[in-house]
Every structure is written in C-alpha cells, then in structure tokens.
C-alpha cells in the first residue's frame, strides 16, 4: 500500500522539526523542505543548516527551495509600500498564503505529495457547512490562528498541522526525547527579514530615495507641537520614542503620509468602535449579505471583542464593535472568530469612532 506523501516546511526551529517527526511516526512518507526567503549576503542561513541536520537525523529527503525573488516581490515590496502609505503591515500573513502555502503546495504537487505541513500551533477542522476552518490550538498561549486567517479552502484541504494538539512544553519534551539537533533552540520573535527589529533602518536601506524626511507632530485640532523623524517610524497607539514632552502620556492616533504629519492625542483618542476592512477571506463562513455577530481580533495579542459584521456593496466589510477597541491599526489584519473557529478576516483600511 502506497504511503501518503507530505512535504513539511522545515524552518530550522523546534516546532516544524517535531511536526516532521510526528508525521513520520504516523506513517507518512515525509519530505523536508526549507523555503529560502531572505539571504541578502548570499551565505547559507543558520535555519537551513539546522533544518538539514534535522532531516538527516530523521532520515528523510531534504531540499532547499529558492524563493528569494518571489519573497522580495510578494512580501518585502508589499511591506515597504504599506509603510510608505502610512500603514503598519503584517508581512507574515502575506507570506503564509502566497508563498508558504501557494508556492509550496504547487511544488508538493510536482513531487506527487498529497499534503503540505507546517509547525504552526493551530488545527484544521471541517464544519457542518462543509467548509474547512482553522481553529485554536490546544494551548491558547501559543495559538497562531491569527496568522493563518487568509488561507483558502483549497489550501486547507491539502494542509496538515500536526502540532496543534500539543503545548510548547510538550513539543520541547518530544524534541529532547528524540534528540533532535534543535531541541534547545530558542524561538524566533522578529520578522525574518528584519532580525534586529529596526524597521526604519530597513526601509532606508531598501528605498532611500522614497523615505519621507522629518515632518510635524500635530494635535487633533491641527496645532503643531514638534517635529518627527518621518512617518515610517511610527504606528497607531505608539507612546514611547516620540521625543516630545507634553507633561502627560500621549499617543500616535493617526498617520498622514500625504502631508507627512503624525497626529498626537490622548489615550481616549486611540479607541474606535468601527473599522472597514478589504481583501476579505471567507474561511469558516460563506460569503453572504446578512449581518453576523462574532468575535474579532485586530492584532496578534488581542484577546478579541464582540462585534457585528456587515458586508458592504463594494465587497469590503464593516466591523462594528460593541465597545471601543484600542489602537485599531490600518494595514493590520482583523480576524473573525466563532468560538475557537476562524470565520475569516481582512486587512484594516480605516478605523472610525
């Protein structure tokens, strides 16, 4: 009997390594792959070195696929463009759908593989309406459903998420028991192409001729109160690093790239009850015109708030929260939930009182 073949995306970390082990243990014919996304100096990243060691340890075939050109076009250029437009993007969401899933599923199909798999802390379920949906991992502290909201039904049908039923502690224990070479490797925290976390410096290296220079800090009534370093250095809700002394805490409540202004306000000024999102992906719910009540998260660490969804005539979605939500940020994703299931989500365009 032919074993089902699965291509596992090996990041060089402990989660994807244990995912590969678990799938092999379950009887799958496992192929390990590292997708090379960002290697500006031309040297082999440590992630590739580590993933290769894991594949050798597990005795599975291993390949490195060069997606650097596609990553630059689909993710890095998008990231830069969003910041220049005064928004705060989430490049991981774009990368997940367009590269880690779309491109990897295409390659897997060429190898005769039925599935791809990753080390994300989430699960996939099939709902009563016949649709696939991402649902919360077994341990809420490592839940990664927010980053996967925009996967398509076709992608979900060909995806396995083997560590969604485990806690991080259990994954570490399995890695140690199996003597995986990355068992003690720490988790990565930053955006992979900006490991030092300095977005401003990265943007200046990428598009030095397009970076806006200094501009005015203004109050909500238009009063100029100081100078800022350039709109790409700020995000909605930011309090630290503003370099202005008002005698009390103040926050970034709006970014205006067209006038190179950063609007400063009080804490209450960064709360909103409404947002408009576009690029809506329907996952657990089908596209429909009727209003729907659910929970929504406006950032990865947001626990979620009750809201009503209302599809607009132009295909965008209006999200009305029952109570004001802090720092709704254009460019970030808003993700809709029904209990533990992801209904869908979109990219925040505007926030309104």
Question: At which residue positions do the language-model features occur?
Answer:
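ATP-dependent adenylation/nucleotidyltransferase module used to activate substrates
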Residues: 1-149, 160, 169-170, 176
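AMP-forming adenylation/ATP pyrophosphatase catalytic core
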Residues: 117-128, 133-353
């Amino acid at each position: 009997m032919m074993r089902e073949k699965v291509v596992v995306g090996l990041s060089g970390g402990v989660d994807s390594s244990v995912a590969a082990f678990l799938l092999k243990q379950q009887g799958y014919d496992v192929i390990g792959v590292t997708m090379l996304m960002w290697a500006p100096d031309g040297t082999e990243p440590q992630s590739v070195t580590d993933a290769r060691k894991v594949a050798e340890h597990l005795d599975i075939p291993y390949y490195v696929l060069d997606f650097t050109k596609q990553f630059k076009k689909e993710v890095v250029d998008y990231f830069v463009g969003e910041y220049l437009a005064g928004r705060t993007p989430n490049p991981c969401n774009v990368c997940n759908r367009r590269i880690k899933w779309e491109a990897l599923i295409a390659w897997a199909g060429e190898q005769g593989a039925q599935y791809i798999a990753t080390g994300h802390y989430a699960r996939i379920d099939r709902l009563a309406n016949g649709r696939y949906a991402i649902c919360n991992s077994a341990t809420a502290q490592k839940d990664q459903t927010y980053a996967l909201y925009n996967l398509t039904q076709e992608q979900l049908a060909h995806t396995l998420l083997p560590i969604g039923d485990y806690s991080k502690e259990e994954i570490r224990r399995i890695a140690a028991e199996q003597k995986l070479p990355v068992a003690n490797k720490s988790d990565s925290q930053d955006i992979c192409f900006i490991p030092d976390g300095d977005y401003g410096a990265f943007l200046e290296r990428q598009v030095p001729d397009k970076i806006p220079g200094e501009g005015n800090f203004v109050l909500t009534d238009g009063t100029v109160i100081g100078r800022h370093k350039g709109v790409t250095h700020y995000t909605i809700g930011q309090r630290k690093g503003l370099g202005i002394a008002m005698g009390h805490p103040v926050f970034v409540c709006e970014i205006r790239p067209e006038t190179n202004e950063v609007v400063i306000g009080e804490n209450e000024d960064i709360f909103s009850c409404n947002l408009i999102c576009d690029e809506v992906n329907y996952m657990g719910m089908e596209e429909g015109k009727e209003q729907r009540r659910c929970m929504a998260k406006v950032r990865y660490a947001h626990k979620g708030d009750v809201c009503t969804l209302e599809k607009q005539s132009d295909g965008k979605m209006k999200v009305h929260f029952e109570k004001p939500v802090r720092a709704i940020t254009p460019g970030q994703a808003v993700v809709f939930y029904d209990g533990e299931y992801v209904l869908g989500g979109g990219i925040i365009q505007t926030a309104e009182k």
